[in-house]
Amino acid sequence: MEITDNHFHLDPSGRKELAVKDFIKAGGTRLVLVHKPYGTWKKIDSFQSQVKTTLKLAVRAREAGAKVAVVAAPHPIELLKLLEFNSPSQASEIYFEAVDYCTSLVEEKKTVGLGELGRPHFEVEPPVWDLANEVLTESLSRAKEVDAAAVLHTESATPEVMADLS
């Protein structure tokens, strides 16, 4: 039987393949490696560099013996960080550049999907919430265009939130 962790993070300054070996020792066989931010990025090249780090970590996880699928996308919190330095339209544009980079990785078969896409899991001002919803909707549309899986990051998993997302 395959034992899968469907939301596994690795950090380049963390335990890396040692964490994967612990997972395998516990009976795990497969994992979905979900990209996470390794620091604030303001431009697309910094984001791409971080995703390339995730892809390298996936290679190390495979070398440790796990079957690995990778998902990558700009984390929802990154939109808020981009808003600190940019107008809403500029922040959205940079965010979508990152989404498009991630969809290209799906097309190149380097990843299986986009993740984590979503919304802040804490309260934000209504205009920011609205922008996060617009960005999420468009990001999911772009994921659908390349038949990519989507890993969602949401504020909770209540029936109300699920209805709002559908």
Stretches with model-predicted labels:
Residues 1-166:
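Mid-domain alpha/beta scaffold segments of enzyme catalytic cores
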